[in-house]
Amino acid sequence: MTNSNRIKLTWISFLSYALTGALVIVTGMVMGNIADYFHLPVSSMSNTFTFLNAGILISIFLNAWLMEIVPLKTQLRFGFILMVLAVAGLMFSHSLALFSAAMFVLGLVSGITMSIGTFLITQLYEGRQRGSRLLFTDSFFSMAGMIFPMVAAFLLARSIEWYWVYACIGLVYLAIFILTFGCEFPALGKHAQHSQAPVVKEKWGIGVLFLAVAALCYILGQLGFISWVPEYAKGLGMSLNDAGALVSDFWMSYMFGMWAFSFILRFFDLQRILTVLAGMAAVLMYLFITGTQAHMPWFILTLGFFSSAIYTSIITLGSQQTKVASPKLVNFILTCGTIGTMLTFVVTGPIVAHSGPQAALLTANGLYAVVFVMCFALGFVSRHRQHSAPATH
């Protein structure tokens, strides 16, 4: 593979995470405007965004098999057509049913693209380099989470309709579409060149189960926490701007943490540093929930920084549980993480209704504690040391 081809594929991976980050994180910014557009209360409008999460979940789950049937380049190009149709549907329809369908299609497209992006990184890089590259790739999720809410705020403040925010997000996919030209993708399944040697199917091992549970609990805990921080802060008497600043601080430090750890992780055993980071994140979240208002910004900044490497490290460790990185295994862990996204409001909504936002934050804290336990237990069964040692760069 030529160096220019590798660079193009790496950039496709970066942008695939940016696309999903933009779609997921911008929701909170536009939800009120969309509710007004359809003359609905915000509470019932939030339920329609479940279609976006459902699309992401289904596509990541199915793409473990779809990758071996449909070439990756074909999937990305077809995804561009679907993206254009979905954005057009948002622009020209006043039907809530069509809005929900468009959101589902956007979820499908971003889920397929993100699973391809993750797989490309696991194919292009090995050993500890794979972990640092995946982490840098995941930082584009947070970067989009910082940039697109600002874009949304800029457009909405000028009374420009909310659907232009999604048109701007579509430009990310346009860049992916352009990069597919003159670019060779790894072939899988029936499209791959098969050697004479029979392919030995590797067993995943119990470590994959620990990682899958950790992925689900981490994403559910993270989104459950960050979704209710503004309400919790407002309940303490903070202004809407100050409450929003806490969320921005979290994602900003999360992004800087990813950049820092993409360098730091190369020097440590991944399972050990993951266990330390999971433990620190659980403690920092508890300090944020129980601390004073004056200390909350500092706790959320450090929480964002030290938790930034957790999810990507879980995926990297999963890919290292077999000698050859398995797209099915990587997609299985991604699917578990996406189930966490789907369950966010299903789990935290009733808790908030019954006991208030602080109870939801404490639940998220408990989920982070489960992540720590899973990562600690993984140390006794993980195969990453025997598989990554020869491949370390």
UniProtKB/Swiss-Prot annotation:
UniProt keywords, alphabetically: Cell inner membrane, Cell membrane, Membrane, Transmembrane, Transmembrane helix
Protein's cellular compartments: Cell inner membrane
Name recorded for this polypeptide: Protein TsgA
GO cellular component: plasma membrane
Family, similarity comment: Belongs to the major facilitator superfamily. TsgA family.
Lipid bilayer topology: Multi-pass membrane protein
Bilayer-crossing regions: 11-31, 51-71, 78-98, 101-121, 134-154, 162-182, 206-226, 245-265, 273-293, 298-318, 332-352, 361-381
Gene: tsgA
Tree of life domain: Bacteria
GO terms, molecular function: transmembrane transporter activity
InterPro entries: MFS, MFS_dom, MFS_trans_sf, MFS_TsgA, MFS_TsgA-like
